[in-house]
């Protein structure tokens, strides 16, 4: 169980100094996210842990980003409410079910808010909350592993609990379907509000997962399985190629800084700016996002053409072909050769897969 001292002002301030994170609100949210995960692990709830916070366990410190929600997958018919006991022992005051179904779509989800008393401000009556998103589906991951709930943000007392998480290859396939705002991914707007921050979170995660894969066999199967389910929920044709194109087009618009669609680029740029507090021990600017976009486009192209080997940038561009002879190559990408050579490398690879 997570130690009660993790919910104190002293602990939050200690972690702020230790990890170099100014936003104590985010630190406290991360701590409570892990506490909710620990509660679920103790409860016997049948679930697989997915989403951004799961990467803090799968990738460890390599993720360098804060995630403050819990996303899980439960078998259809699971009554999640029966597992939400012992809230006070896990640092929570209460929870509220927000909705059982996503408006306008047939996605079998539930959303709950878990409220806790804010410690870092030293105020007794200030509350905040974290979200639990539950997707009611059978597990579609090919490889699942059990990992301990362990992080530099928390300390535990007694035995550390285990949770089931997807492999790097599986969750990369999942994340790629989420970085497709016009089809299966996080849309530009939800209920009239910009979701660009969530889009950039998917992009950032793809960039970190990219470094852990050399073969896309597992990713390809996970992508196809998840993509077909998501297309079905949205009433779209069961043609995964529209997702590949969506990923590439979104990535290209970002890399060309809005040359294709200035309004959508402005949204993505705003998402990058709002994402900055969520990374630590590193920085994340438009140039970093362009590199990650080039990786996403390259991966989408490899999957589309059923090429499983991933080539990685070594710092050498001398082996790349002359792009003047390549059909459909956007000449504006040539600027990246000097300004952002890593992004240029992956864009060349994306346009020369076949």
Feature names for model-found ranges:
Residues 1-48:
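Helical scaffold of the NTase/Pol beta-like nucleotidyltransferase catalytic core
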Residues 287:
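Penicillin-binding protein/beta-lactamase superfamily catalytic region
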Residues 37-70, 74-76:
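Active-site nucleotide-donor binding segment shared across nucleotidyl transfer reactions
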């Amino acid at each position: 169980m997570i130690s009660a001292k993790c919910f104190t002002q002293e602990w939050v301030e200690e972690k702020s100094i230790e990890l170099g994170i100014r936003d104590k609100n985010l630190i406290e949210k991360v701590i409570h996210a892990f506490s909710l995960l620990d509660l679920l692990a103790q409860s016997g709830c049948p679930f697989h842990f997915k989403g951004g916070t799961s990467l803090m366990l799968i990738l460890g410190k390599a993720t360098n980003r804060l995630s403050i929600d819990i996303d899980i997958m439960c078998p259809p018919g699971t009554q999640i409410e029966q597992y939400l006991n012992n809230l006070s022992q896990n640092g929570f005051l209460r929870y509220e079910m927000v909705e059982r179904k996503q408006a306008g779509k047939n996605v079998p989800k539930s959303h709950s808010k878990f409220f806790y008393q804010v410690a870092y401000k030293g105020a007794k009556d200030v509350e905040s909350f974290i979200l639990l998103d539950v997707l009611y589906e059978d597990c579609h991951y090919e490889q699942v592993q059990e990992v301990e709930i362990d992080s530099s943000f928390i300390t535990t007392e007694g035995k550390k609990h285990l949770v089931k998480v997807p492999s790097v290859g599986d969750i990369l396939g999942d994340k790629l379907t989420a970085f497709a705002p016009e089809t299966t991914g996080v849309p530009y707007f939800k209920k009239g509000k910009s979701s660009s921050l969530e889009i950039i979170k998917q992009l950032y995660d793809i960039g970190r997962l990219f470094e852990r894969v050399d073969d896309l066999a597992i990713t390809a199967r996970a992508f196809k399985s998840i993509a077909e389910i998501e297309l079905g929920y949205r009433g779209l044709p069961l043609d995964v190629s529209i997702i590949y194109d969506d990923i590439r087009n979104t990535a290209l618009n970002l890399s060309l800084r809005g040359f294709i669609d200035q309004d959508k680029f402005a949204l993505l740029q705003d998402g990058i700016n709002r994402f900055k507090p969520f990374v630590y021990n590193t920085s994340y600017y438009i140039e970093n996002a362009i590199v990650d976009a080039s990786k996403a486009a390259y991966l989408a192209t490899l999957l589309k053409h059923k090429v499983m080997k991933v080539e990685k940038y070594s710092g050498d561009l001398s082996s790349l072909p002359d792009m003047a002879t390549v059909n459909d190559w956007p000449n504006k990408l040539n600027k990246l050769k000097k300004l952002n050579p890593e992004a240029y490398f992956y864009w060349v690879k994306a346009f020369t897969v076949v």
